[in-house]
Amino acid sequence: MPVYRDEGVVLRTAPLAEADRIITVLTRRTGRVRAVAKGVRKTSSRFGSRLEPGTYVDLLLHSGRALDTVTQADIISPYGATIAVDYPRYTAAAVMLETAERLTSEERQPALRLFLLLVGGLRTLAGDERPPALVLDAFLLRALAVSGYGMALDHCARCGGPGLHLSLSVPGGGVVCPQCRPHGAASVSAGAVRLLADLLRGDWDGALVSDARARREAGGIAAAYLQWHLERGLRALPYLERA
């Protein structure tokens, strides 16, 4: 397909030569693609600010050997620009975008569920109706789940025994019962486990009544679990502001 149309979220940009940029986009149908936007850094560029990180765009692209080329871009929703005015939301979005890129390790592999989660997460951040940290943690847990790394929260990750288990093994895949608890497993609070479970299944009524301590603990667990499966840290995570 020499020329194709797709919609996607801009994950990252990088300068190329004097006036161009390489953009990385998670698309609805094609998965993660990289493409050159020629002349985008010129003040007279026809693309304007349409290809900034976090922007949801409709794209017309020309396929290339190593990189595609953007020939047309129209904004569907300027999530990135809306979110950027608020630092906690901006840093949460930055972690989302980097996570989406890292979870799509291969280019041109469709990842529709991850794409829909990312669009939904950015839309929620832009709406500013829920705490950014909770929106981020919900995205991280669900993104890991659709990528095959779901965290066990309502049953033992080892034996499958149901219940509210208060030991966590990140390498083991989630909470574990007393009989299966491995050496080095961490103790976690019931509030944090319940909050993580609420976020994973989208129970916002339950999540929003959680207290600040449970939110901090749950956020740390979600970040640790993510980075374990990514096998290295996220560049954006140290800048995250959990307001």
Swiss-Prot record:
Domain of life: Bacteria
PANTHER family in the cross-refs: DNA REPAIR PROTEIN RECO (PTHR33991:SF1)
Protein role: Involved in DNA repair and RecF pathway recombination.
Species annotation: Frankia casuarinae (strain DSM 45818 / CECT 9043 / HFP020203 / CcI3)
CC annotations in GO: bacterial nucleoid
Protein family according to the UniProt entry: Belongs to the RecO family.
Family annotation (InterPro entries): ARFGAP/RecO, DNA_rep/recomb_RecO_N, NA-bd_OB-fold, RecO, RecO_C
Protein name per Swiss-Prot or TrEMBL: DNA repair protein RecO
Key words of the record: DNA damage, DNA recombination, DNA repair
GO process annotations (BP): DNA recombination; double-strand break repair
